[in-house]
């Protein structure tokens, strides 16, 4: 099962945390390719969702939804 990001929710979480694309990459340890996929609404695996949500201090369900 894969998930895609809720863009507005991600933008809000990033603003609230003073985080950027680069900051998120450093906090999660994910590759720039993976972060790019997330930012562009491409489907990602659950562990990626959890890493991003944890880095931003939110629950993964607030940032991601199932991809069709």
What are these regions (language model features)?
Residues 41-54:
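Short, basic-rich loop-to-helix N-cap that marks the start of a DNA-contacting helix
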Residues 57-68:
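Short C-terminal boundary/hinge segments that cap the last helix of small helical domains
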Residues 29-44:
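Recognition helix of helix-turn-helix/homeodomain-like DNA-binding domains
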Residues 12, 26, 37, 65:
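DNA-binding alpha-helical recognition surfaces that contact promoter or target DNA
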Residues 27, 55:
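Residues within the alpha-helical elements of helix-turn-helix
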Residues 23, 34, 62:
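Residues in the helix-turn-helix
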Residues 1-23:
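A short, Lys/Arg-rich alpha-helix, primarily the initiator
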């Amino acid at each position: 099962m894969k998930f895609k990001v809720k863009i507005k929710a991600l933008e809000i979480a990033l603003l609230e945390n003073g985080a950027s694309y680069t900051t998120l990459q450093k906090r999660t340890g994910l590759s720039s390719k993976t972060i790019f996929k997330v930012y562009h609404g491409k489907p990602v695996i659950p562990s990626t969702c959890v890493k991003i949500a944890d880095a931003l201090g939110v629950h993964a369900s607030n940032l991601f939804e199932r991809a069709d």
